[in-house]
């Protein structure tokens, strides 16, 4: 689920607002064009936009998912971690019988991905602490998204921005897991199994591999694989990916996704066109994203207690947390008191002038 081009190219695209076609290899998309259809954004919206108390309101969801004008937090790895395999669950390829990599090497790559995403998940939990003061009241300066959020590399100070950024990066990776791995798909039954047609596990979401709250080694099925990726992504593989399962052979990155329902149609990659592989990958990514959002809420409760976590979740989901979530900070209460006092003073002055005139 990522744009397969250099980070410098991505920066130029954003600056120019001209989304030129990307290189032939692409992941679940973050842009519109070149075969991509903002797949990450639409998956995230399908997973987390709903009318309930624990769902994200429009402006907040736009910051997390993107809105067509920017990547959003979930697209950030395609801007700053485009060449980091662990951020996209790449390079965990393996095939039984005379393969150039061992099962242990593939499992190590999966583990590296999980540990990377655990780090992002834990950072989101950590940054949520900055949403509230020591009394559990919302700090308005930390929760408003006016003007958008700056990239983490530019020192964005607001707790809501940074918590959403870290969680979005974790979501990017778990969504990529379904697009880039054999977890949810199946091989083409009309062709022999091999590096160009690896076996699929056809398993549902959520995946036991993606235990982001855990600390132990993930349980990796013996036939699980993700694709080897190089810039010249092809079948058969070239360079370090020669004789290996490649991203080009295994990905189910592109197609149309309904941002409201998650319905997936018109798959755009060879593996995605096999059976219902693209739809399975999208469904898996939607289900997993919802699961990780529940996991984040549970992690906040474990870390901060039920009362503080409840206010944190409200602050992370609502567009106007000081008004909607209660528990205003001392600064907000003082400002409200001052405004009320001024109002009473004006009323009193008007009444006094009226009596004097009489």
Positions of PLM-derived features:
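C-terminal membrane-anchoring or membrane-association module
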Residues: 343-358
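Catalytic PLP-binding core of fold-type I/II PLP enzymes
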Residues: 172
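Juxtamembrane/start-of-transmembrane alpha-helix segments at the extracytoplasmic/lumenal side
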Residues: 327-339
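N-terminal, motif-rich segments that launch catalysis or mediate targeting to/interaction with membranes
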Residues: 24-168, 176, 180-326
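Bacterial N-terminal signal peptides that target proteins for export
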Residues: 1-9
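C-terminal segment of classical bacterial N-terminal signal peptides
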Residues: 16-24
